[in-house]
Amino acid sequence: VQTCALPISLDLKLAEVYAAAEKKAVNERPPFLRAEQRGWIKGRNDCWKSKDVSACVEDSYRRRIVELQTLYRLVEASGPFWFVCNGEPANEVVVTYFRTDPSTLIAERGDQMSLMFQQPAASGTYFQGRNESFREHQGEVLVEWGWGAPTMRCVRKP
């Protein structure tokens, strides 16, 4: 994929963020960062299949920058916040919000983790991960964890 039309600022920003992530990942075992970056490059290169190649490439860069900022805690965060779901204290979701563009959160449930991106919502806030979602509206929190899973009603712990 040609990245010539890509704003140089995105390429420079990714290089800066990747370098910061490398510093934090120095003791990772096994080393995931480089492998993930190679996978990201392959995905970005698949943008040639897209109807709008430049939009695909730009979105790919923006998402990768945010993923690195979030997963390696390179930006300001608020939380963690604990939520009890379906009235069961053992059914807990822990959420940390990150000041990224777009906004993100990491939700943890048991030994699973989901990076979610903020999506447009008519009201309240809505975050979507691969197979998970987190919706806050007027004090009510709805979480879906896993493809086709039932919606859980959650309450933030004081």
Each model region followed by its residue ranges:
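Short, small-residue-biased leader/transition segments that mark boundaries at the very start
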Residues: 3-6
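A generic short alpha-helical patch detector that favors 3-5-residue windows
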Residues: 9-10, 32
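Alpha-helical transition-metal enzyme core signature, strongest for iron centers
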Residues: 11, 36-40, 44, 61
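Alpha-helical segment that forms one wall of the substrate-binding/catalytic cleft
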Residues: 11-21
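Cysteine-centric segments in proteins
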Residues: 18, 62, 66-158
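Surface-exposed, polar/charged faces of alpha-helical domains
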Residues: 23-38, 42, 49-55
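Charge-enriched, short contiguous segments at helix-coil
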Residues: 48-67
